[in-house]
Amino acid sequence: MKDNNLSYSNHTSEAGHWYDQDGTPKYTIVGANGVERNTTLRDAKKFNYVPSVTSVLDILAKPSLEHWKLNQALKASMSMQRSEGESLESFMYRCIQDSKEIGLTAAREGTKIHAMIEQGFVDQTSSEPYDAIIEYLDTNYPDQKWIAEGSFCSELGYGGKIDLYSEEGIFVDFKTKDNIRDKEPSKLVYDEYGMQLSAYAQGCGFVDKAERVSIFVDRQEVGYISCYKWEDDTHSKHRDMFNSLLSYWKLVKNYDPSRQA
């Protein structure tokens, strides 16, 4: 397990990321031309890197996300004006690009919020999301030694960077969403979130039992959180779902970096 990265500028989602067999992040690599670039599957095969948990999960279909993207594109088409003489293809392209910017803005806000939370666990720097989260954790899981942004590599051939976990096997993941105040926590979660936490737990040696918590932070009201504790009996289900997906990922990519291979 590797120490956390404290730099906000380097605080990025682990999606599309790679790790070496010691759990060290290998998000970028210096190419033959001496220029640093993003690590590719070809690089991973050469150096025996493993994919991140979210890279594996990314091959899943995400109907809710695709529906959200479609809605954003439709909203853009209703709010934007088509220029005189502009082709339909050009207008559609502008609408799609505008809707993508909405998603990028949301992602940037999420990254900023994650960084504030991480900094709080590193040096107790106060912020609205951190203060709300630590109050919840101290109440429900007292006397824990929390580790923020620790990375790992599993012998099964995957790795990851965990938002927060304790040495006793409590795994916490932070998500940012809009307008969550009037929604039940159970309405905010998907099996994918449970799979992510179970994969982290398994990768850290908690194969059969782990406490898993998804904490949602409102992007517009960052001091408001909604917390969902996963049922214990769903851990084995989500673990097996992830492992099945991992096997599929290896077949699709024609690459198995596991130490059991």
Give the ranges of each region predicted by the language model.
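Acidic, carboxylate-rich catalytic segments that either coordinate divalent cations
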Residues: 261
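Mg2+/Mn2+-dependent nuclease catalytic core
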Residues: 146-257
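Metal-dependent nuclease catalytic cores that hydrolyze phosphodiester bonds in DNA/RNA
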Residues: 1-159
